[in-house]
Design a protein with these regions (language model features):
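Periplasm-facing N-terminal accessory domains of Gram-negative outer-membrane beta-barrel systems
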Residues: 20-124
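Periplasmic N-terminal accessory/gating domains of Gram-negative outer-membrane beta-barrel systems
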Residues: 58, 82-83, 87-102, 111-214, ...
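Transmembrane beta-barrel wall of Gram-negative outer-membrane proteins
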Residues: 245-274, 284-321, 337-359, 401-403, ...
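Outer membrane beta-barrel strand-and-loop segments of large Gram-negative receptors
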Residues: 297-299, 391-397, 435-448, 529, ...
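Face-selective signature of the C-terminal outer-membrane beta-barrel domain
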Residues: 301-319, 339-474, 595, 608
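Conserved C-terminal beta-signal and adjacent last beta-strands/turns
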Residues: 301-303, 637-744
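Surface-exposed extracellular loop regions of Gram-negative outer-membrane beta-barrel proteins
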Residues: 318-320, 326-327, 369-371, 419-427, ...
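Gram-negative outer-membrane beta-barrel transporters
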Residues: 454-460, 558-562, 581-673
Length: 744
């Protein structure tokens, strides 16, 4: 039966359809009295001025662009007898957008040409909480904020906070950074302990999503990075070479280039980096903490006629880094290391049958390796581990527009292979673990259907359902309904939104076989709690978005989620091997406030302020994975190590067109995480300063300089303590550095 189900899904996938981040835009052209304006010329331009598409409004004043990639755009509208209109907006991946453009009649005695300009500050159809950043937004940020996805999320995603051992927590979960790349998601976690990561420099857009996920986003929760990658066709034969250097051996050299040859667009990116404080160390002064890595990306886009688009994305990376020591281990020469490798390929095909119907297919693959190398000293504990994962999949969607309904149905078929090994010699440590080596094959089959529509004026509904079957170390099946509502108060420029999501989340794939092995064969009988289990959740969210002024918005969100078999990371003794653990139940609730001010051209000022209030509880007993030496009785409540009640971030920047001068600051505050059965760690506040200007220019070439100071006051605060036997980790110390960026 299982084989028949998978085969039938696969055959449907071959004849059915992942949308390559293509989004429809529709709207109506009216005059200021509400009358239809037919025959208006409507052109869609990218932020840099390239015309993407141009159409004419029909007899009822309607226009529609069937497939548009996410990004920043300007919609230019002109009609005889009317002043022109210019409308700026940012298009999210996979969210249809409806607009009403109002044109003003020309006065017969007035000879001057007037163009009405406006912008989309608050999206009236957004039913969840998300924050999109375009390539132009990312280019305006200082380098330390965009070094990695962790840096980006820590500063720009509401409620994100550091957890122990370089993990990040978002909305009550430690496995919280899930990448959705060109419509494809993977089970792999992006934290530096598991992955060399993806550079934000290859992003065309990134949508930082924290709640209200439609069925196509699968069963990711907490924090999702919906990423669209850069296309060479947009670079038009231009590129960059960037070098950054800072104290603590922080160096980064990267370059990119893109262009178009006939119908083929091409984009290349390479990056090499080092750091003398690669991981968060177990004491204020880092010891044996050097890391280095490299990443490369290539993307090819080919358009065949007006109906077919092919895209091939290739990514590869690796990192070698030392496992930081405490002073006692450093003195005896402990030298454990870790090596990570990862390669990804995504081939996508989009076919347009008509302006109303799109069909698309994505084939994807990811392979990698993780090797934990032992220390050569004779005294400290020895840990040896390896992991070789493989993911193969096909993700398919069919999109159709019908009488105001944006319908989408799809499936996702994934084949997984996981090979793991582990050996630990405590050398006097009281913990004893049996050696392990094994492999397992499994997979996931998912189907979904969803609708985005407006039942009546100013109300938008996202309605859908998803079915998932997952089989690896554990088998589970669930049907998950999703609903989101958004009501637009036109007069006050406000949006009230609410969402309910049911989730079915596979266990973290990293060392899940090892965790399940220990769950069955632990030396101590009370640690035999079985396989790592799937996490099921009910998720509720309500929010308010308000336009305070053009390009200035205020958003307030509140959420509650409860679930069974919640996840957390747990380290095996002091092996630096982190395996998943399940708790019987979890409850997390909180609120977030975001004040966003996009750059005001008149003043050259942009800024962003975020505050999050949250509380998370886990309830015993431990129900799967590696239980450790701290068992919980049924109903016993604990606060996880990543829980931080108050979190705040702020960025403020000033840009001046003269000489390309800019300056700004990024600040972060945290009230402190919890120590198990003890007090909270002290609160902390850090600030970064940055400035830059153009050294030389000869269009289109120019050379830019940037100067940065991170953690200005050198506040090396305590981040988190995962358990009694694991040391506290400490935040990065102050760095002083700069960069040169050559654009050609």
């Amino acid at each position: 039966m299982r084989r028949q189900l998978i085969i039938s899904f696969f055959l449907v996938g071959l004849i059915s359809t992942a949308v390559c981040a293509q989004t429809p835009i529709e709207g109506f052209i009216r005059d200021n009295a509400g009358n239809i304006v037919a025959g208006a010329s409507v052109s869609l331009k990218r932020a840099e001025g390239t015309v993407v598409q141009q159409i004419t409004s029909d007899a009822i004043g309607k226009f529609r662009f069937a497939a548009v990639e996410a990004g920043a755009y300007t919609l230019r509208t002109e009609a005889p007898g009317f002043y022109g209109s210019s409308y700026d907006f940012v298009l999210r991946a996979r969210q249809p957008l409806s607009l009403t453009i109002e044109l003003q009649h020309k006065q017969s005695l007035q000879q001057t040409v007037e163009v009405k300009s406006s912008s989309l500050t608050v999206n009236p159809e957004k039913t969840g909480s998300s924050y999109i950043f375009t390539r132009q937004d990312l280019d305006l940020l200082p380098d330390p904020l965009t070094n990695s996805t962790d840096d980006l999320v820590n500063n720009l995603m509401p409620g994100a906070s550091d957890s122990h051992d370089n993990f990040l927590a978002v909305r009550g979960t430690e496995f919280s950074l899930h990448e959705f790349i060109n419509g494809v998601s993977f089970l792999d976690n992006t934290q530096p302990q598991f992955s060399p990561g993806v550079s934000p420099q290859i992003f065309e857009t990134v949508d930082l999503m924290t709640g209200g996920f439609t069925p196509e986003y699968g069963n990711r929760f907490g924090g999702v990075l919906d990423i669209t990658t850069r296309s060479g066709a947009d670079l038009a034969g231009h590129g960059d070479v960037n070098f950054r250097g800072a104290t603590l051996d922080n160096y980064d050299l990267n370059a990119d280039y893109g262009g178009q040859a006939g119908k083929l667009g091409y984009y290349f990116f390479v990056d090499g980096f080092t750091s003398g404080r690669y991981l968060e160390p177990p004491q204020p002064q880092e010891l044996y903490d050097f890391g280095k890595g490299s990443r490369a990306t290539a993307q090819f886009d080919w358009r065949s006629g007006n109906h077919d688009v092919f895209k091939l994305l290739l990514m590869g990376g690796g990192a070698n880094f030392q496992q930081p020591n405490i002073t006692k281990d450093q003195e005896v020469g402990r030298n454990a290391q870790r090596h990570l490798r990862q390669q990804t390929a995504i081939l996508s095909w989009l076919h347009s049958f008509s302006p109303d119907t799109l069909i698309s297919t994505s084939l994807y693959e990811r392979t990698g390796s993780d090797r934990v190398l032992p220390t050569s000293d004779p005294d400290t504990p020895v840990s040896i581990a390896s992991r070789v994962p493989l993911t193969l999949g096909i993700k398919s969607d069919l999109s159709h527009y019908w009488h105001g309904h944006f319908l989408k149905a799809g499936l996702d078929l994934v084949r997984l292979r996981e090979n793991e090994s582990f050996f630990f010699d405590g050398r006097g440590d009281p913990d004893v673990f049996p050696a392990f080596s094994g492999g397992l094959k499994g997979g996931q089959a998912s189907v979904y259907v969803q609708d985005h529509f407006s039942p009546f004026r100013d109300l938008t509904v996202d309605l859908g359902v998803r079915y998932d079957y997952f089989d690896l170390v554990d088998t589970g099946v669930q049907t998950s309904p999703r609903i989101g509502l958004a009501y637009h108060f036109n007069k006050t420029k406000s949006v009230l939104h609410a969402a309910y999501n049911r989730y079915f989340s596979p266990p973290p794939i990293e060392y899940s076989l090892l965790a399940s092995f220990i769950g069955h064969d632990a030396v101590k009988l009370d640690q035999r709690v079985g396989n790592v289990r799937l996490y099921t959740q009910n998720y509720y969210e309500v929010g308010w978005a308000q336009e305070l002024h053009p390009r200035i918005s205020l958003e307030l969100n509140a959420y509650l989620h409860t679930g069974r078999n919640s996840f957390e990371n747990h380290e095996i003794s002091i092996s630096r091997i982190f395996v998943p653990i399940n708790f019987h139940a979890a409850r997390s609730q909180g609120g977030e406030l975001v004040l966003n001010m996009r750059q005001l051209e008149r003043f050259g000022i942009s800024g962003r302020f975020q505050y999050a209030l949250s509380k998370t509880y886990f309830y015993g007993p431990i129900t799967g994975g590696f239980a450790g030496d701290e068992p919980l009785v049924a109903g016993e409540r604990i606060i996880p190590a990543f829980d931080q009640t108050h979190t705040g971030t702020a960025q403020i920047f000033y840009h001046n067109r003269w000489g390309g001068f800019w300056m700004g600051s990024a600040m972060r505050y945290g009230s402190g995480t919890i120590i198990e059965h003890g007090p909270r760690l002290p609160q902390h506040f850090t600030s970064d300063l940055a400035t830059g200007f153009t050294l030389w220019t000869a269009e289109p070439r120019h050379l830019d300089f940037e100067f940065d100071v991170t953690n200005v006051f050198d506040s090396i605060y305590q981040i988190a303590k995962e358990s009694e036997e694991i040391p506290i980790q400490y935040a990065p110390s102050r760095t002083i550095g700069g960069s040169l960026k050559f654009h050609f």
